[in-house]
Amino acid sequence: MLLLLLGFLGPAACWALGPAGPGSSELRSAFSAARTTPLEGTSEMAVTFDKVYVNIGGDFDAATGRFRCRVPGAYFFSFTAGKAPHKSLSVMLVRNRDEVQALAFDEQRRPGARRAASQSAMLQLDYGDTVWLRLHGAPQYALGAPGATFSGYLVYADADADAPARGPAAPEPRSAFSAARTRSLVGSDAAPGPRHRPLAFDTELVNIGGDFDAAAGVFRCRLPGAYFFSFTLGKLPRKTLSVKLMKNRDEVQAMIYDDGASRRREMQSQSVMLPLRRGDAVWLLSHDHDGYGAYSNHGKYITFSGFLVYPDLAAAGPPALKPPEL
């Protein structure tokens, strides 16, 4: 994930954060850190870090594990947590004191099993907001060694924060979304309606440009260019997890799959960058048959995010195929 972070730190992907005001040419805020030692669930709960790879703007405090927003805007966060043998894993992405935004979870406790779970989300932050990782406080939860990585960076500064740095120049093209689903889904051969339906979402975290329809589960490209997409899903016990990232009607771009028969809840993540034309649709397709499903609850196991990395202002052409009827 660090390579992805460093690759996206160009000015077209995120405007770097510096002192706002006259003479400031860019807005920059980015960090990436790691914890290299185990951590068991305690009353403290905050995951702290002992290794910092990047801390542009100095907004991340490794000793407390907290990122503090200095420039309001939309930020992309990702984290990976390793599970200790004989322990369960439950790590939450938290905003401010107790606003859980997304969750990484694995309750597989086989002897000697070393596993990891990842999660990502985009959040709209105001000045002074904090974002951190919380390990479940019960003693049956723990991070293994190496424990975790945590990264985040400013994708789009708010217009008011951006104005002093940009002056009278035309505003940059912007398109970004992040959504979560708090309900599980279970496939059924007897279910009515079409099989190829986009996965719908009930929680909208960010929707800059209004290009994502959460209820329909479809992102529609308004600005041609290169987009980054990531998605994470929880696996239902004893069910097969099969979810595809689709472009337009039937173009499979990436896939999550797990047919393990475990009765424990687990998670899978995937990400990809796609070139899109105006009118292209991107959505998630869950295999809707008996024996398939995906797990979520109020902790938001299921997430879907995407944002414009580099616009292609010269692109032209007719709109692409429409997504399936919902």
Curated annotation (Swiss-Prot):
PROSITE patterns: C1Q (PS50871). Keywords: Cytokine, Repeat, Secreted, Signal. The keyword Phosphoprotein does not apply. Residues 164-193 are annotated as: Disordered. It is found in: Secreted. One of its GO terms (cellular component) is extracellular space. GO terms for molecular function: cytokine activity. Induction: Up-regulated during acute colitis induced by injection of dextran sulfate sodium (DSS). Pfam families: C1q. SMART domains: C1Q. Its main location: secreted. One of its GO terms (biological process) is cell surface receptor signaling pathway via STAT. PANTHER family: CEREBELLIN-RELATED, COMPLEMENT C1Q TUMOR NECROSIS FACTOR-RELATED PROTEIN 4. May be involved in the regulation of the inflammatory network. The role as pro- or anti-inflammatory seems to be context dependent. Seems to have some role in regulating food intake and energy balance when administered in the brain. This effect is sustained over a two-day period, and it is accompanied by decreased expression of orexigenic neuropeptides in the hypothalamus 3 hours post-injection. This is Complement C1q tumor necrosis factor-related protein 4. It comes from Mus musculus. The lineage of its organism: Eukaryota, Metazoa, Chordata, Craniata, Vertebrata.
